[in-house]
């Protein structure tokens, strides 16, 4: 490592332009912008082939509390909260303590209704159905005053034969949603009068079944008894909507996905694509197509397989007994690889359903990637791990939770932006947590395109479930079958998991091993399925001694395995905090509103944050903003400790998925990116500690030794040069050296032992910093700075920062020079949101670093300089000010 080094960020200008281009997509996040409520299109009739559809979505709906007057306009898809917010009937649930003021919404029934016009050509079809892609949750549907159905599952796709209930011309649809919020009271007192509400009747029926089974043993004093009073055990609705330790309860209802009338002669129900890979040569696809053919006509399925828009194979097959199966050979197959390991080509399989007159009755397109994925169990000291196309690799990424506690506020553009962020930070895997709602196809599509593998969890979390009830189990079977059929073609899905952290209970095996596992293996042969994520002995590790037990970060050094959940909390960015507080709330980090937005550890999460700040950074700062920034630095430091330990110990550890990538409401949580999509220090740090090539230290303080490891996740061996320096806190070099390294593909190995005992004896352990820089082909690929003591014991002088600003195509280029060590240096525009090419970096004395900054609004150079703040950890940590 040379002094006066100009450091180039690893975020290229092209990547930076792509990142900033997506900023506008995020403005729909509530409270983060002035985005308005946009009405949707009105319904209209469309013909595709011989299928006729009438979209019932749009802004022609009205919604009213049952038994009340004064309805408001409703948008479909949508939900009751967005409709009431648009009408000004409720306050912003995210602001201050407003969430307490909107709880009544989930405790009362709501009625959605509209009229619509049916054209003769729709009713002329042999079959006409109402297709509801998502009803949240306990619904009763009437058309023209006639009862159609009473669905009770938020996650299912509902189809009802309604031809006999329709007429040409004006028709009327009414959907009533019974409240889900009041089931908690019913569960706690199952003998109370339910008032005849279907929701309450459901809970009482299930409770009675368990009362008969367990008798007097089922009491409110037992864990199982308490859990049975929780509505998330009974109702097939996203569990987090009743509140979690990172969000409050927001019990939604409404038509949250598309709704339409479909008229058809025959239609395709499902297309499943199964692969058979030979050692060399072509890949054989077996395309299984299921159709609905009410007229029992002679039908033919025509198949066209395309890559990059060009046809690579065609075939056709006669449909027999509403099914057909055809093998199609793909010559010169292009394999799909995870992010960082290769390309992610996607093959499109188009299926046209034709009658004997060659008329296309229906058409479906499905995409897939050609790959062989294996999940190997723990064995002979090796952790559970993934292998793709014969290559074992380390899984890097995070856990995904819903992007908003009001789902209709989340757009495909927002989801894609999050997935792009993950790919830019070298993630190759995400875990879709089991307590939310099933992620939409647009999110899986983005993962397919970006090479992000997925651990798919069915939506069961942290509760026992009423497996004794036959109707409840039938409901779940239909839900699971739908999810497997919808998602099995996605190459991104690596692991199917039955639940998140559901403790063993009477019926566990029946639900998670036999029922869900059986359906996965039936519909997706060869897929890897585990009954639950984080289950003891599974090899899928959730570790919470750090944070949960307040253990120090060094506790991570005792953990091995396929780690899919671990985390430390921090506050969101000050700008985000300002969206949910007023000025008086920000006079103290411990104010009532600041505590209201912290839901972890039974409301003691702020105390946990302060515990870790004290442990590593000494007495926290007095002002709120400094405490916020310092909490983010602390979080990044802790998670980096765990990730680098597991990467250094590759084979004994083969995954590091951080809890959690994102937020669904604003407040202090474990997230890497806050609710307003502002990157925390941890997200910036992840791009460095998840880099394909990593240089990482292992300190043995008592021995006066630092072992340097090089981790190479790439598919090729690398050769490079390492420069290292030991400096004082004032930037004086006391020792340095260089050496060459060779790192085989997909390995971790110790490359050097650096001894600092003599320097420590002369200067003191708390007066030294170790720096190292790894270059491959002359380019910096990884660097590090490590201290030999906790940060609070480093008494740093002022770094002597200077900077220049110039306008550039992507915004502004900022060049920062430092005379002395500048630790955890970051840029921030005080009153303006912006995207930054990097942040929270360590600047070696005498170095110059270049940032690219893209503000949300247009600024002159003078305005930009007025907003710009350049800070280091020394500015926000009193104990480190030497």
Positions of the model-derived regions?
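Active-site oxyanion-binding pockets that recognize sulfate/phosphate
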Residues: 160, 242, 337, 466, ...
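Secreted/periplasmic carbohydrate-active enzymes, especially glycoside hydrolases
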Residues: 4, 8-430, 648-649, 653, ...
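Charged/polar, solvent-exposed surface patches and flexible loops
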Residues: 417, 478, 482, 518, ...
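Conserved acidic
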Residues: 108, 414, 472, 508, ...
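Substrate-binding/catalytic cleft of secreted carbohydrate-active enzymes
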Residues: 429-602, 634, 638, 643-645, ...
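Substrate-binding clefts and catalytic carboxylate motifs of secreted carbohydrate-active enzymes
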Residues: 56, 63-66, 238-240, 247-254, ...
């Amino acid at each position: 490592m040379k002094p006066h080094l100009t450091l180039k960020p690893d975020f290229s200008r092209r990547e930076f332009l792509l990142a900033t281009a997506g900023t506008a997509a995020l403005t729909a996040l509530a409270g983060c912008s002035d985005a308005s409520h946009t009405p949707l299109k009105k319904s209209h009739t469309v013909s595709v082939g011989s299928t006729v559809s009438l979209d019932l979505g749009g802004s022609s709906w009205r919604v009213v509390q049952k038994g009340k007057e004064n309805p408001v306009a409703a948008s479909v898809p949508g939900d009751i909260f967005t409709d009431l917010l648009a009408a000004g009937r409720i306050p912003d649930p995210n602001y201050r303590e407003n969430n307490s003021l909107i709880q009544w919404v989930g405790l009362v029934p709501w009625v959605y209704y509209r009229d619509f016009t049916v054209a003769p050509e729709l009713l002329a079809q042999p079959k006409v159905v109402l297709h509801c892609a998502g009803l949240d949750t306990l619904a009763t549907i009437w058309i023209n005053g006639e009862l159609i159905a009473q669905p009770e599952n938020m996650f299912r796709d509902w189809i009802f034969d309604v031809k006999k209930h329709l007429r040409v011309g004006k028709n009327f649809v009414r959907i009533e949603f019974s409240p889900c919020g009041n089931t908690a009271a019913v569960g706690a007192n199952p003998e109370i009068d339910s008032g005849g509400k279907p929701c309450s009747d459901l809970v009482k029926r299930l409770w009675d079944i368990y009362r008969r089974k367990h008798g007097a043993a089922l009491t409110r004093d037992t864990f199982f008894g308490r859990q049975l009073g929780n509505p998330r055990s009974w109702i097939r609705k996203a569990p987090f909507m009743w509140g979690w330790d990172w969000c409050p309860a927001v019990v939604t209802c409404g038509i949250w996905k598309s709704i339409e009338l479909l008229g058809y002669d025959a239609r395709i129900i499902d297309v499943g694509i199964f692969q058979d890979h030979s050692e060399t040569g072509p890949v054989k696809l077996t395309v299984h197509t299921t159709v609905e053919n009410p007229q029992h006509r002679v039908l033919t399925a025509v198949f066209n397989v395309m890559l990059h828009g060009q046809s690579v194979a065609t075939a056709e097959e006669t449909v027999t007994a509403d099914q057909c199966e055809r093998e199609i050979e793909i010559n010169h197959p292009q394999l799909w690889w995870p992010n960082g390991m290769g390309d992610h080509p996607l093959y499109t399989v188009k299926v046209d359903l034709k009658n004997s007159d060659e008329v296309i009755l229906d058409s479906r397109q499905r995409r897939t990637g050609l790959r062989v994925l294996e999940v190997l169990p723990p064995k002979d000291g090796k952790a559970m791990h993934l292998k793709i196309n014969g290559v074992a690799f380390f899984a890097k990424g995070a856990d995904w939770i819903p992007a908003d506690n009001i789902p209709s506020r989340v757009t495909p553009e927002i989801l894609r932006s999050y997935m792009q962020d993950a790919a830019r930070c070298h993630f190759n895997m995400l875990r879709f947590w089991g307590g939310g709602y099933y992620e939409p196809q647009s999110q899986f599509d983005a993962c397919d395109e970006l090479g992000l593998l997925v651990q798919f969890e069915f939506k069961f979390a942290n509760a026992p479930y009423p497996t004794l009830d036959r109707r409840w189990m039938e409901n779940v079977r239909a839900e699971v079958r739908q999810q497997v059929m919808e998602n099995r073609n996605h190459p991104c899905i690596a692991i199917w998991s039955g639940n998140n952290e559901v403790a063993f209970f009477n019926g566990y095996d029946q639900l998670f091993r036999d029922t869900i596992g059986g359906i996965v293996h039936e519909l997706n042969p060869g897929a890897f399925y585990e009954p639950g994520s984080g289950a003891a002995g599974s090899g899928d590790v959730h570790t919470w001694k750090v944070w949960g037990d307040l253990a120090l970060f060094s506790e991570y050094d005792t953990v091995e395995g396929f780690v899919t959940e671990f985390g430390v909390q921090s506050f969101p960015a000050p700008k985000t905090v300002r969206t949910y507080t007023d000025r008086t709330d920000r006079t103290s980090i411990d104010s009532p509103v600041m505590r209201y937005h912290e839901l972890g550890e039974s409301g003691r999460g702020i105390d946990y944050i302060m515990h870790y700040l004290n442990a590593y950074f000494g007495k926290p700062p007095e002002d709120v903003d400094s405490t916020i920034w310092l909490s983010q630095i602390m979080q990044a430091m802790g998670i980096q400790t765990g990730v680098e330990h597991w990467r250094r110990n590759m084979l004994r550890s083969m995954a590091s998925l951080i809890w959690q990538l994102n937020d669904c409401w604003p407040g202090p949580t474990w997230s890497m990116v806050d609710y307003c999509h502002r990157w925390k220090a941890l997200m910036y740090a992840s791009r460095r500690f998840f880099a394909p090539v990593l240089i990482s230290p292992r300190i043995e303080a008592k021995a006066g030794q630092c072992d340097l490891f090089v981790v190479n996740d790439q598919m090729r061996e690398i050769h490079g040069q390492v420069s290292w320096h030991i400096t004082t806190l004032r930037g004086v070099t006391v020792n340095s050296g260089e050496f060459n390294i060779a790192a085989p593909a997909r390995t971790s190995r110790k490359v050097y032992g650096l001894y600092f005992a003599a320097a420590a004896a002369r200067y003191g352990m708390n007066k030294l910093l170790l720096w190292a820089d790894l270059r491959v082909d002359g380019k910096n690929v990884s660097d590090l700075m490590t201290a030999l003591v906790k940060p609070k014991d480093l008494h740093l002088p002022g770094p002597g920062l200077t900077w220049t600003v110039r306008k550039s195509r992507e915004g502004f280029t900022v060049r920062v020079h430092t005379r002395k060590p500048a630790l955890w240096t970051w840029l921030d525009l005080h009153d303006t949101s912006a995207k930054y090419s990097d942040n929270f970096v360590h600047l070696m004395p005498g170095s110059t670093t270049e940032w690219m900054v893209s503000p949300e609004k247009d600024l002159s150079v003078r305005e930009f300089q007025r907003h710009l703040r350049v800070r280091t950890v020394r500015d926000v940590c009193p104990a480190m000010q030497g």
